[in-house]
Curated annotation (Swiss-Prot):
Residues 125-223 bind DNA. Residues 2-116 form the Response regulatory domain. The modification 4-aspartylphosphate is found at residue 51. GO terms for cellular component: cytosol; protein-DNA complex. Its main location: cytoplasm. Phosphorylated by CopS. One of its GO terms (molecular function) is phosphorelay response regulator activity. PANTHER family: REGULATOR OF RPOS (PTHR48111), TRANSCRIPTIONAL REGULATORY PROTEIN CUSR-RELATED (PTHR48111:SF41). Keywords: Activator, Copper, Cytoplasm, DNA-binding, Phosphoprotein, Plasmid, Transcription, Transcription regulation, Two-component regulatory system. This is Transcriptional activator protein CopR.
Amino acid sequence: MKLLVAEDEPKTGIYLQQGLREAGFNVDRVVTGTDAVDQALNEAYDLLILDVMMPGLDGWEVIRRLRTAGQPVPVLFLTARDGVDDRVKGLELGADDYLVKPFALSELLARVRTLLRRGSSLQVQTSLQIGDLQVDLLKRRATRGGKRIELTAKEFALLELLMRRQGEVLSKSLIASQVWDMNFDSDTNVIEVAIRRLRAKIDDDFEVKLLHTCRGMGYMLEAQDEG
């Protein structure tokens, strides 16, 4: 699942991004309302987490512009203001939930998962499949041929990225930015090691191989015709 966090306070933003990633989510973060609108209209997200008070555009204006543009992505508001009028305003503008700061990460995660299950006005994708490899996005589980595959959070995020873009060759730089949130360094072998470990888990025990190396270009997940 891919989430967008719009939070201008650095400490809170980093805390949210790290906590959500450790829970297995793919997370992008912006610090202004203007960037939140641009990202949400140009990228596919399963959920937006918006701070109400942000520079540029506030959270109210962000959701107003998104809904006007026909973007129905679920929205969870974060705010330090606990007034009934504020909660009502957010919900009337099209927000799906409202959480008051300070909050416990466990409560935030519970609300995020509830919104993803509910799907709001979207049909949220809850599973991915290629060949006999299946991924349950809500339970964060992977199976192949009915056999459970144990994955770390990073391995799951890598597999989810490859499955969402199956048939595409993904470069090391793209994988590094999407899964590790870092710029690719040619001196590090973190991507190769992660791919090797993932391949050992999803391919080594099976005749049909799904994870392919495209030399000089990157990696691709595809159920290629053996014939």
